[in-house]
Swiss-Prot record:
The keyword DNA damage applies. The keyword DNA repair applies. This is Flap endonuclease 1. Binds 2 magnesium ions per subunit. They probably participate in the reaction catalyzed by the enzyme. May bind an additional third magnesium ion after substrate binding. Keywords: DNA damage, DNA repair, DNA replication, Endonuclease, Exonuclease, Hydrolase, Magnesium, Metal-binding, Nuclease.
Length: 338
């Protein structure tokens, strides 16, 4: 999922309150994938309704978004469009991993190994078209705006921040920086304790903010060189150079200046290198969008979540009330400007 340059970035711990009154462009695909991975039963089974349809994403989207807007955050979800042709290899590899993980999950369940079952179940998660359409509808009736990107959601989210239509991008991946996002927030969808795979150890998952300029200054490079580092390590569009991690890539780029000089020096080749860079420097994005928050529709929320998907009516009503209260507070803040 994206490029592995996290060790090079300057991360700062923040609180939800630090994002109050800020517009956050949320990488929808990334966030839904998190919900599908995390919101599971002990044996790894996702939440489902009486028809066997997965509802983990709906649960995460409703309750976490309610918490965000309650904290004064203004989320706008950005959905992926058609992936670039150069991403086909990565998508095929992800499909193979999901299928293999699903088989291992079933075997672990049959053996009664719940820890292994949960681990493999998480890796088998898939955001399909039904999940996307249900998520968009839920956001609509929650009064939360969403935008359809023509291509990569992270590129569109970065574009919105650069246009000052949003204050930061929310994503677990680091690709947003390659697309030019000035500020990225991580762990917005889930904070708290997380168990390390295969170990009886729990770590704190805290909200992080990363500033692109701060990172570039600390590393002594520019954004173009950061893109070169990512390509050396590997991106969704290329495999990267053999035995080159982020720290080695940084040294190589600082020594030689750019990736063309690096591959010349090493006698290597990266297929379609200039086309890969072009995907980051000139991504396919749109200005045809509107960001507008509305009021939640309690009746439609109850019908969709409770009647159709077997959610607890009491919990849905409480979440709707939280969304309404936040919507009222948002309107009151707007009124103060006039």
């Amino acid at each position: 999922m994206g490029t592995d340059i996290g060790d090079l970035l300057q991360k700062r711990k923040i609180e939800l309150s630090d994002l109050s009154n800020r517009v956050v462009a949320v990488d929808a695909f990334n966030t839904l994938h998190q919900f599908l991975s995390i919101i599971r039963q002990r044996d790894g089974s996702p939440l489902v309704n009486s028809q066997g349809k997965v509802t983990s994403h709906l649960s995460g989207l409703l309750y976490r978004t309610a918490s965000l807007v309650e904290a004064g955050i203004k989320p706008v979800f950005v959905f992926d469009g058609k992936p670039p042709e150069m991403k086909t290899g990565t998508l095929n590899r992800r499909k193979e991993i999901r299928e293999s993980s699903k088989e291992k999950w079933e075997n672990a369940k049959a053996e009664g190994n719940l820890e292994a079952a949960y681990k493999y179940a998480q890796a088998s998660s898939k955001v399909d078209q039904d999940i996307i359409e249900d998520s968009k509808y839920l956001l609509d009736i929650m009064g939360i705006p969403w935008i359809q990107a023509p291509c990569e959601g992270e590129a569109q989210a970065a574009h919105m921040v650069l246009k000052k239509d949003a204050d930061c991008v929310a994503s677990q991946d680091y690709d947003s920086f390659l697309f030019g996002a000035p500020t990225v927030v991580r762990n917005l969808a889930a904070t708290g304790k997380r168990k390390l795979p295969g170990k009886n150890v729990y770590v704190d998952v805290e909200l992080e903010m990363i500033e692109l300029e701060e990172t570039l200054d600390s590393l002594g490079i520019n954004r173009d060189q950061l893109i070169d580092i990512a390509i050396c390590v590997g991106t969704d569009y290329n495999k990267g150079l053999e035995k080159v991690g982020p720290k080695t890539a940084l040294k190589l780029i600082k020594k030689h200046g750019n990736i063309h000089a690096v591959i010349r020096e090493k006698g290597m080749e990266i297929e379609a290198l200039d086309s890969i860079k072009e995907l980051f420097t000139h991504p396919d994005v749109t200005d045809d969008y509107e960001i507008k928050w509305g009021k939640p529709d309690s009746e439609k929320l109850i019908n969709f979540l409770c009647d159709e998907n077997d959610f607890s009516e009491d919990r849905v009503v409480k979440a709707a009330d939280r969304l309404k209260a936040a919507s009222g507070a948002r309107q009151q803040t707007l009124d103060q400007w006039f």
